[in-house]
């Protein structure tokens, strides 16, 4: 006998059934991409002859850590890059991006962001906020940006004009951040990279957070020179406990490695302290976990479309990251939605989220995140700045069944309050 563990109302059960039927074709497409990416990662493991001995951790300087070296090689192969540096010592995505930016840019260089203003958390790295903290601006690196066009897409004409100033770096943020603009496809990134290469010798860097394994190819296979991301997002597969990666052209990765450690030492040092096994398991499981997260996003889009809300991307649109934005129109709905997501978490389900002043953001933020790894956004989470357009951005889901249940609980919470 089928048991209704969470006492869902008939309204929400019917909405769930309708959303599942609506999402069926997109789910099949996600399964195909997941299988392709899983085979790609498996091939990288086999080519690199991974063994039990590679999981042993090193201490001290970390000289000769074979596991660390093979993990770098697996990431490079999976991402179609010449080289990679994957380290648990990268504390978050912002830190990893910061290492890459400081590794590649020098005083007098110009960083040109061609996808509008980047994530709030990177502003203080660039020098858009804060003074005297050691930002790129403090070290004489100039910053310019090209706004997106009215459709939220890269403005190629404006980018071409900006390239006349010969920037040292063209920076692309693949994901949407706290905006409703579309995430960028690898094909769109390729188009930007081709334009850049035709006009100057700038480094094309991509913030790849939330985008790994969503498509069959990565930006480094489509013209990007360097990419960076977090291991507590897609690439860590909900198993890596911390860390980040940088992948791309060998000489550029080397420069980033010199920044991550010291000039002259680079990738040759850095003990792994027993984290190798988790990091290997994480990237191996990443394609499947990303597939589950994508299904959760499509399911949520389908359900909330049927409730009459604007969602982006829609349940039928192509996906280029794992993020789903739901425009819930009022702060009350944001709060109740996040309470519902939190109530469906395996960890801290009893906690009631409240808006708070989160470091790095310019408005109060409410977050739902009951994760095994603190701050993980490949595990189901939702965040919403309490500002117009009162949208919530949700992402992640270790497995689809549990993530789907949490979305249903969020809908139930809204329904009980008379908000849908």
Each PLM stretch: what is its role?
Residues 58-59, 85-88, 322-327:
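Short glycine-rich or small-residue beta-strand-to-loop segments that form or flank ligand, phosphate
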Residues 83-86, 109-112, 168-169, 202-204, ...:
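Structural motif
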Residues 58, 78-81:
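Flexible linker/loop signature enriched in Pro/Ser/Thr and Pro/Gly
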Residues 305-420:
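Conserved C-terminal alpha-helix-loop-beta "cap" of PLP-dependent enzymes
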Residues 2-24, 31-32, 40-47, 51-54, ...:
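Conserved PLP-enzyme active-site core in the AAT-like
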């Amino acid at each position: 006998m089928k048991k209704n563990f969470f006492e869902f109302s008939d309204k929400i059960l019917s909405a769930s059934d309708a959303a599942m039927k609506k999402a069926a074709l997109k789910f099949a497409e996600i399964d195909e991409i997941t299988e392709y990416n899983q085979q790609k990662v498996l091939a990288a493991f086999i080519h690199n002859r991974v063994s039990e001995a590679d999981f042993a951790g090193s201490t001290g300087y970390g000289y000769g850590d074979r596991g660390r070296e093979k993990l770098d090689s697996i990431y490079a192969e999976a991402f179609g890059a010449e080289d990679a540096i994957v380290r648990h010592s990268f504390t978050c995505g912002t830190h990893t991006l910061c290492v890459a930016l400081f590794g590649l840019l020098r005083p007098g260089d110009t960083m040109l962001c061609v996808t509008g203003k980047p994530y709030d958390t990177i502003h203080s790295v660039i020098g858009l906020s804060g003074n005297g903290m050691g930002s790129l601006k403090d070290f004489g690196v100039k910053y310019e940006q090209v706004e997106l066009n009215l459709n939220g897409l890269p403005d190629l004409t404006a980018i071409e004009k900006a390239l006349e100033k010969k920037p040292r770096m063209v920076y692309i943020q693949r994901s949407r951040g706290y905006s409703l603009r579309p995430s960028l496809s690898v094909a769109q990134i390729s188009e930007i990279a081709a334009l850049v290469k035709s006009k100057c010798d700038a480094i094309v860097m991509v913030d790849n957070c939330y985008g790994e394994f969503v498509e069959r190819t990565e930006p480094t296979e489509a013209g990007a020179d360097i990419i960076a991301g977090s291991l507590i997002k897609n690439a860590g597969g909900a198993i890596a406990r911390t860390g980040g990666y940088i992948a791309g052209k060998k000489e550029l990765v080397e420069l980033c490695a010199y920044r991550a450690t010291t000039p002259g030492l680079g990738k040759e040092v850095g003990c792994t302290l027993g984290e190798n096994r988790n990091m290997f398991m994480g990237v191996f499981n990443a394609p499947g976990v990303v597939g589950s997260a994508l299904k959760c996003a499509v399911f949520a889009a389908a359900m909330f479309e049927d409730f009459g809300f604007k969602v982006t991307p829609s349940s039928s649109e192509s996906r280029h990251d794992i993020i789903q934005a739901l425009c819930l129109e009022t702060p009350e709905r944001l709060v109740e939605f996040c309470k519902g997501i939190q109530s469906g978490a395996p960890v801290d389900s009893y906690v009631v989220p409240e808006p708070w002043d989160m470091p790095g953001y310019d408005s109060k933020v409410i977050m739902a995140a009951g994760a095994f790894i603190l701050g993980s956004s490949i595990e189901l989470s939702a965040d919403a700045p309490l500002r117009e357009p009162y949208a919530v951005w949700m992402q992640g889901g270790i497995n689809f069944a549990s993530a789907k249940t949490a979305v249903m609980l969020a809908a139930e919470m809204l329904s009980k309050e008379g908000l849908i």
